[in-house]
Amino acid sequence: MLRRIAALSAIVLAAAAPLQAQAYVYPALQPSRIAEREYNFALADMGDGFGTGLIFQWREGLGNPKLQFTLDAGFADPDAPNADARLLIGGGLAYQLTSATTDMPFDIVLAGGLGLTTGDDVTTVRVPFGAAIGHRFPLEGDIAITPFVHPRLSWDRISFNGNSDSDTNLNVDIGANFEFKPQMAIRVAAALGDDDAVALSFAWTPKGLRK
């Protein structure tokens, strides 16, 4: 029992100093172009004792060619001994603000959402908003690479055993999307700033829905 209390205390202290929490801590993995439909499977090292997470992301166009809905779902295994796995869930909207042209070479996506993490009586709510900025470079054949940055500001709130606290945090994702097949890509990103984390993912776009 004492070991479990110590493990819970370690999680709370790590998450509340000062509220270094996302809908757990992982890169958004949002490239600089929205998708009509995309399924993204990610493995993340969440850093700062938060452990390893498995995340599924579903991105879906909303009929408007500039709008996209995103759903995140997954779980994390904290590093603290005897700590329970934590459920991760979130949703958001993305808007294609600009597309690259000869005059303005960057694709820009505005993205915001709401994320929830719960487990071991600790609940974290995160409301992020930012912009993914990048450029797609076609290479040989179907191969292309899109480096991107994604600065975002978030309001985070953590609750434990009737107590709660909140803070505003700034993070910047630096990443790249590597397309190696018409419907397949490998995506890697690191989140830097108030929270540090890295993630590697496989993204699949169903045939006929590739942008």
Where are these regions (language model features)?
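Outer-membrane beta-barrel transmembrane domain signature
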Residues: 22-40, 47-50, 61-64, 97, ...
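Mid-chain, structured segments of secreted extracytoplasmic proteins
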Residues: 66-105
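Surface-exposed strand-loop-strand hairpins of Gram-negative outer-membrane beta-barrel proteins
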Residues: 43-55, 75-79
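Bacterial N-terminal signal peptides
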Residues: 8-16
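Bacterial N-terminal signal peptides that target proteins for export
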Residues: 1-9
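Non-membrane alpha-helical segments in proteins
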Residues: 55-57, 72-76, 110-113
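Bacterial Sec-dependent signal peptides at the C-terminal "C-region" and cleavage site
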Residues: 16-22
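Short coil/turn segments at secondary-structure boundaries
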Residues: 14, 80-81, 121
